[in-house]
Regions:
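Glycine-rich nucleophile elbow surrounding the catalytic serine of serine-hydrolase chemistry
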Residues: 146-155
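Conserved small/polar residues in nucleotide/adenosyl-binding loops
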Residues: 160-165
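Alpha/beta-hydrolase fold nucleophile elbow
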Residues: 135-146
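Short beta-strand element of the alpha/beta-hydrolase
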Residues: 42-51
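Alpha/beta-hydrolase active-site loop
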Residues: 98-133
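Conserved HGGG/HGGXW glycine-rich cap/lid loop of the alpha/beta-hydrolase fold
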Residues: 55-57
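N-terminal cap/lid segment of alpha/beta-hydrolase-fold proteins
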Residues: 2-37
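Active-site machinery of serine-nucleophile hydrolases
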Residues: 62-109
Length: 170
C-alpha cells in the first residue's frame, strides 16, 4: 500500500492510495478523507460508491463532502469502480461493461471472473486494509452511492444488515 497523493482540506487530510488487490489481481486506487478528529482517535467512516464510467477520483475532485465530513468528524472513502490495466479483460466497444463498470458484483464467467470481483473487494478486502491502516471505526460505518454505486450500496446493505428496512433511505 502506498499513499500516492495527499493534500490538506478543511483541516483534514485527503489521501489517494494505491495497493495490489488480491480480489481483482491488479493495482487498485481509492481516496480517503480523514477529518481532524482522526488525529486523536478513530472516527466513523462513510463508504461512497461511484457510478458507471467513474473512478475513485470523480467525487473526490468534483464533490464537496470534505467540509461537512470535517465538521462531523467522519472519514469518507471512495474506492474505484472496477479493475483497470492492460491485462484486464474489457469490452472496449461497449462503455457499459469493463473498465469503469464493475457494478460492485463478482463476475462468474471467464475471463471476467479473474479480475472483476468488486463485491468481494468493497465488502471484504478493502475494508480489512482500511481498518488495519487508518484511524477509522469498524463498528460505525455507513455506505451510499450514486447510480451504479447506489446499486452496490443497496445490495451491500441488504446482504450485510440484519434489519435493512431501517437502514435504507431512498
Amino acid at each position: 500500500m502506498e499513499v500516492i497523493d495527499k493534500f490538506h482540506s478543511h483541516d483534514g487530510e485527503q489521501l489517494i492510495v494505491k495497493h495490489y488487490s488480491s480480489s481483482n489481481k491488479c493495482e487498485m486506487k481509492f481516496s480517503l478523507f480523514l477529518p481532524p478528529a482522526s488525529r486523536s482517535g478513530k472516527v466513523p467512516i462513510i463508504w461512497y460508491l461511484s457510478g458507471l464510467t467513474c473512478s475513485h477520483a470523480n467525487v473526490t475532485e468534483k464533490g464537496e463532502y470534505r467540509q461537512k465530513a470535517s465538521e462531523l468528524g467522519i472519514a469518507f472513502i471512495c474506492p474505484d469502480t472496477s479493475p483497470r490495466g492492460e491485462n484486464i479483460p474489457d469490452e472496449k466497444d461497449n462503455w457499459q461493461f469493463g473498465s469503469g463498470a464493475g457494478f460492485y458484483v463478482d463476475a462468474t464467467q471467464d475471463p471476467y471472473n479473474q479480475n472483476y470481483n468488486m463485491f468481494s473487494y468493497v465488502t471484504d478486502e478493502l475494508p480489512k486494509l482500511v481498518f488495519e491502516n487508518f484511524p477509522v471505526k469498524e463498528e460505525t460505518q455507513g455506505i451510499m452511492g450514486h447510480s451504479m454505486g447506489g446499486h452496490g450500496a443497496l445490495i451491500t446493505c441488504l446482504l450485510y444488515t440484519s434489519d435493512a428496512a431501517d437502514e435504507v433511505d431512498g
